[in-house]
Amino acid sequence: MIQKHCFECGTALIEKELEEEGIVPYCPKCQQYRFPMYNVAVSMIVVDEETGKILLIQQYGKPSYILVAGYVNRGEAEEHAVVREVREEIGLEVKYLRFNRTKFFEPSNTLMCNFTAFVRTAKVLHINHEVDRCKWFTPQEARENIRPNSLAAEFLNAYLDEVGNKPMEM
């Protein structure tokens, strides 16, 4: 998604060279460069700290499993968004977390920040209205059940490749 108008005054942006940046959108009225705006979201590989199992969810009537994820609120740190989203969507408390990687997701104009969120398993999960179903998987089962060719699969597989299918060993 490319901005066409200034977010301050609404004037049509032009392309203008900026030293060491290349061509950047520019507002001739405000006389300011307008760098691209995008969303920021977090996705989490939720790991049971005792068993090493990974929680995957299904959402919005879709049959495929994905990672828990959500948008970062304005002014909110990504780490706080991880804790908030895990608590809101599945009712678990994050004991500790680990940053994994980021990747820009073009379809939603979103920078995705992936973390591993280690939790203590609750006997009953309290899923909210955003989650249809959730299930614990071994690392290998998680690889097999995550939505194929998705960013969630890319994050999960990269993480498991790094830790050798042993999520508790960092």
Language model features with spans:
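Unchanged
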Residues: V72-L97, R101-F155
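Conserved N-terminal beta-strand and adjoining loop/helix that marks the start
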Residues: T11, G22-I23, P28-I54, Y71
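Conserved Nudix-box catalytic region and its N-terminal flanking loop in Nudix hydrolases
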Residues: V47-E88
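Conserved beta-strand and immediately adjacent loop positions that scaffold enzyme active sites
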Residues: H5, S43, K53, N114, ...
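Short glycine/serine/proline-enriched coil/turn segments at secondary-structure junctions
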Residues: P36, S64, E106-N109
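Charged phosphate-binding loop/patch that engages nucleotide di/tri-phosphates or the phosphate backbone
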Residues: E154, A158-M170
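Short, intrinsically disordered, charge-biased short linear motifs at domain edges
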Residues: C6-L18
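Residues immediately within or flanking Cys/His clusters that coordinate Zn2+
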Residues: Q3-H5, V24
